[in-house]
Amino acid sequence: MSGNSQLPPDVIGFICSKYDIILASTSPRRYEILHDIMGITDLKTMVSTFEENLDKMNYSTDPIGYVCDTSWHKAQNIIEILTDYEDENPNEIDKPKLIICADTIIIDKSGRIYEKPKTKEVQKKFLMKFCYEDDEPVNVVTAVTLIKWYGRENFELVPFRDETKVYFDNKIPLRILEEYVESGDGLEVGGGFKIQGQGAILIEKIEGDYYNVVGLPLNKTFKGLYAEANSI
């Protein structure tokens, strides 16, 4: 991703003058969206230690609830970390924080959740299903939980989500799909494809925010940050 098209620096400067902006994720794609595209050059990071082990069987009829709850639990874990830090450093005075927690899943028309394939064999099965078996798009859902943090006794959680429909090309030659799998690209992402990489070859079109498929809905995330900065 290129950082050539950033939002006006005075807008980002306004938000950053009110809050420290923190990404609670190790995802390089989410970092690039916020740092390179949105232009938050002083972006800080934290790591949630939530195990992301919610039982999917409890969400068989509500897969979107799974991603929303995962994002929410990540935020709750960050609150615990911030609270512990505040307890250990009672005299430290920090700027208020806006912390971005997120989780992304791929869902097919039946409600099945597709996670990281980890092996090329599983990845190929995923992509063949998306391209040749399903007659409807897959749904990419990112749930975001913003933490508006002033301190352990003064914080607020602001959840939102975005959905993007991804239409795979059912006429793509199998050889091309197999070559993509052999490239190793997409093994470590949900669904087994990267829209920002060679995986885009397999995709005919999308409906919704491109950056949501990458890992974070840029438009809704920016509006969330801007709204909170304006609420002071």
Swiss-Prot record:
Query: Which reaction equation describes what this protein catalyses?
Result: dTTP + H2O = dTMP + diphosphate + H(+); UTP + H2O = UMP + diphosphate + H(+); 5-methyl-UTP + H2O = 5-methyl-UMP + diphosphate + H(+); psi-UTP + H2O = psi-UMP + diphosphate + H(+)
- What's the impact of mutating K74A? Loss of activity
Cysteines engaged in disulfide bonds, as pairs: none
User: Known consequence of changing F193A?
Assistant: Decrease in activity
Impact after mutating E188A: Decrease in activity
Task: Name the top EC class.
Answer: hydrolase
Tell me the SUPFAM superfamilies matching this sequence: ITPase-like
Query: Positions of the site: Important for substrate specificity?
Result: R29, T104, Q196
What biological-process GO terms show up in the record? nucleotide metabolic process
Known outcome of mutating N77A? No change in activity
Changing Q196 to A/E: what effect? Loss of activity
Subcellular localization is given as: Cytoplasm
The highest taxon in the source lineage is Eukaryota
The cofactors required by this protein are: a divalent metal cation
Primary site of residence: cytoplasm
| HAMAP family in the record | Maf
> Which family does the similarity line name?
Belongs to the Maf family. YhdE subfamily.
Primary role: Nucleoside triphosphate pyrophosphatase that hydrolyzes dTTP and UTP. Can also hydrolyze the modified nucleotides 5-methyl-UTP (m(5)UTP) and pseudo-UTP. Has weak activity with CTP. May have a dual role in cell division arrest and in preventing the incorporation of modified nucleotides into cellular nucleic acids.
Q: What else is known?
A: Present with 1940 molecules/cell in log phase SD medium.
PANTHER family, A to Z? BIFUNCTIONAL DTTP/UTP PYROPHOSPHATASE/METHYLTRANSFERASE PROTEIN-RELATED, BIFUNCTIONAL DTTP_UTP PYROPHOSPHATASE_METHYLTRANSFERASE PROTEIN-RELATED
The protein's name in its UniProt record? dTTP/UTP pyrophosphatase
- Source species of the chain: Saccharomyces cerevisiae (strain ATCC 204508 / S288c) (Baker's yeast)
